[in-house]
Every structure is written in C-alpha cells, then in structure tokens.
C-alpha cells in the first residue's frame, strides 16, 4: 500500500485514539450481524441467534481482538502486507476456506467502527487512508487464493 506521509500520520493519529480490542470485537460482531452468512465460519462460537447475542458473545469478542491485533501488526508493516499476512492467507484459504470477499467486508466494518468511536476526529483524510489500508490488508489476505 502506497501512503503519503500525511496519510501515515492520519492513520497513526486515529489508531492511537482507539481501544483496539473494542474496535475488533465490534467490527467482527457487526460483520456477523450485517452479513449473517459469515456466521458459518464460527459454528463453535455458541449463540449467534440475534444481534445482542452476537455483540455480547465472549468468543466473538476474543476473536475480534485476535483479528484486530493482526490488523494492528499490519499497520507496522504497511510496506510488506503480503509478507505480514502470508500465513493467515494460507490458513484462511487452505484450511478454513473463507470467501476472500469477507476480508473486504470486515475491512469496511473496521472503518465504520472507527468512525463511530472517533466521531469528528475520524476526518475524511483519515477515512481515505484507512480505506487504502483495509483494501491492502484484504488483498494481502486474499493473496494465497490467486
């Protein structure tokens, strides 16, 4: 992902203002509610029968933290997203058989949740930069599929 210094600064500033675990839990929860077909990958998570069940589910929150920790690590390696996410791409392709389109959907959920948490502090410039990053991460996670 090619980012200008201004975009890198916008990402760093915005990311520094959020609780990553909350962002991850809410983003994954929203993905499962808004796109219910994604729930099939999480059969072992227990009750996902309603929005409140999903958003309150401890396993969703824990996996959301795991997802966002990987995303956060990617923010430290923006010049090598494919390398950073190579093993996760392989896992999701070969073992879990996740539709790579879901990575784009989750990326959009991350941006939506960031906007919700940061309000006016999530400037259009920050959003534009994050959209580039989530697209780059989705592409890196989809790399093994090609």
UniProtKB/Swiss-Prot annotation:
One of its GO terms (biological process) is hydrogen peroxide catabolic process. The modification Phosphoserine is found at residue 44. It comes from the Eukaryota. The modification N6-acetyllysine is found at residues 59, 82, 144. Heterotetramer of two alpha chains and two beta chains. Belongs to the globin family. Heme b binds at residues 63, 92. Gene3D superfamilies: Globins. PANTHER family: HEMOGLOBIN FAMILY MEMBER, HEMOGLOBIN SUBUNIT BETA. Keywords: Acetylation, Heme, Iron, Metal-binding, Oxygen transport, Phosphoprotein, S-nitrosylation, Transport. Involved in oxygen transport from the lung to the various peripheral tissues. The modification S-nitrosocysteine is found at residue 93. It comes from Urocitellus townsendii. Pfam families: Globin. Residues 2-146 form the Globin domain. GO terms for cellular component: blood microparticle; haptoglobin-hemoglobin complex; hemoglobin complex. This is Hemoglobin subunit beta-S/F. The lineage of its organism: Eukaryota, Metazoa, Chordata, Craniata, Vertebrata. InterPro entries: Globin, Globin-like_sf, Globin/Proto, Hemoglobin_b, Hemoglobin_oxygen_transport. One of its GO terms (molecular function) is oxygen carrier activity. Red blood cells. The modification N-acetylvaline is found at residue 1. PROSITE patterns: GLOBIN.
């Amino acid at each position: 992902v090619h980012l200008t210094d201004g975009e890198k600064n916008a990402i760093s500033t915005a990311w520094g203002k959020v609780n990553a675990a909350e962002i991850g839990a809410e983003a994954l929860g929203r993905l499962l509610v808004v796109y219910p077909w994604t729930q099939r990958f999480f059969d072992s998570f227990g009750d996902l029968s309603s929005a409140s069940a999903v958003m309150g589910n401890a396993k969703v929150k824990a996996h959301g933290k795991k997802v966002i920790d990987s995303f956060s690590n990617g923010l430290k390696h923006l010049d090598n997203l494919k390398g950073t996410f190579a093993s996760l791409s392989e896992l999701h392709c070969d073992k879990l058989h996740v539709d790579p389109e879901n990575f784009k959907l989750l990326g959009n959920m991350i941006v939506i949740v960031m906007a919700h948490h940061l309000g006016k502090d999530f400037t259009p410039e920050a959003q534009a930069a994050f959209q580039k990053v989530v697209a780059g991460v989705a592409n890196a996670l989809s790399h093994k599929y090609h």
